[in-house]
Curated annotation (Swiss-Prot):
Gene field: argG
Annotated HAMAP family: Arg_succ_synth_type1
Origin organism lineage: Bacteria, Bacillati, Bacillota, Clostridia, Eubacteriales
Oligomer and partners: Homotetramer.
Binding positions (L-aspartate): T118, N122, D123
Name the record gives this protein: Argininosuccinate synthase
UniProt-annotated binding residues for L-citrulline: Y86, S91, N122, R126, S175, S184, E260, Y272
EC number annotated for this UniProt entry: 6.3.4.5
MF terms (GO), sorted A to Z: argininosuccinate synthase activity; ATP binding
Organism name: Clostridium novyi (strain NT)
Catalytic activity: L-citrulline + L-aspartate + ATP = 2-(N(omega)-L-arginino)succinate + AMP + diphosphate + H(+)
Family named by the database record: Belongs to the argininosuccinate synthase family. Type 1 subfamily.
GO CC, alphabetical: cytoplasm
Amino acid sequence: MKEKVVLAYSGGLDTSITIHWLKENYNLDVIACCVNVGQDEDFDEIKKKAIKSGATKIYVEDVKDEFVSEYIYKGVKANAVYEGKYLLGTSFARPLIAKKLVEVAHKEGAKYICHGCTGKGNDQVRFEVGIMSLDPSIKVIAPWRIWNIKSREDAVDYANANGIEVPVTKEKIYSRDQNLWHISHEGGDLENIRNEHKTDMYCMTVPPEKAKDEVSYIKITFEKGEAKKLDDVEMSPVEILEKLNKIGGENGIGVIDLLENRLVGMKSRGVYETPGGTILYAAHKELEYLTMQKETFHFKQMVSQKYGELVYNGLWFSTLKESLDAFIDKTQEVVNGTVRLKLYKGNIMVAGMESPNALYEESISSFGASDFYDHKDAEGFINLFGLPYKINAMIQLKNQEN
């Protein structure tokens, strides 16, 4: 009986040719596993295509609920962003996909897992570190680091030579990754950084200049940092994100053109659409401004950066990341309330907030009289706060005189 390999299967170019290649070079039974994290695909067709391409069996795992509630929502609570711009759409999905691949491997008794990630990308690290973190006994096959196919153009040629249908041509060569959170576009004419990206590549969003002329208002209600209601209607995390994607897309929200520092050492360019996620991050951050004590908020900003780096680098299952989750969950106990936003042609503006945990008190913050704040107290505070700088200036003047 042949040994088995579980292939992370998408039906796209890379994994479509990988089934044929694995059977040709390793003589393994290929168990395809397609993990549904919200990508816009016909999964019945993917099942047919996997079997037609030579897979022995195909699993389609619908994990959208888990993806949003256990992965994306953790990122939102952390305000996790990579290099100030990237909302980690691909990075959030990879550890969950790795987890499902390991589960299928255990179920099938497979010793191998195969992925179609290139040897220059971050995803090979994310998948393999995730897999070894969950089961170090599983061996990983990474064709892009082994075979003679050196480019996506070569992959198209291989597919055509072997009669494998792929949804890519040499003329339209963008590499895309889509899930419920985002879609990314890489490769092709984007590799020349002199080129402005073409807005006709957009899938989730209209260009801001072509967005509707009317302003959109929305309200998002959070409990312990997690979005629970949209416009006062309670919804599941998936429903909230789907609605926000639609609203954000109509208003041209959430497109970035990013030149990022990859984990593997090079810079790469990608265009990312994250309409609903951009809105969710904005609303959540505004509520943190309102409800968090200053020192907690400032420290959490440092944690957010580190958290984003850990997720980007594929360290979702690391002790440090899990420890930061515990800290973040503690900070989110006060992040309760409703944020109203105004959306217009790519812009997000705050249009009001309320929270039972608000640390803003109008009677204190107002320029008018207050029983809680005596203006005279400011003089002593300023003297003490400025004392080190006053002493420093005195010493410098004294030294100059001497």
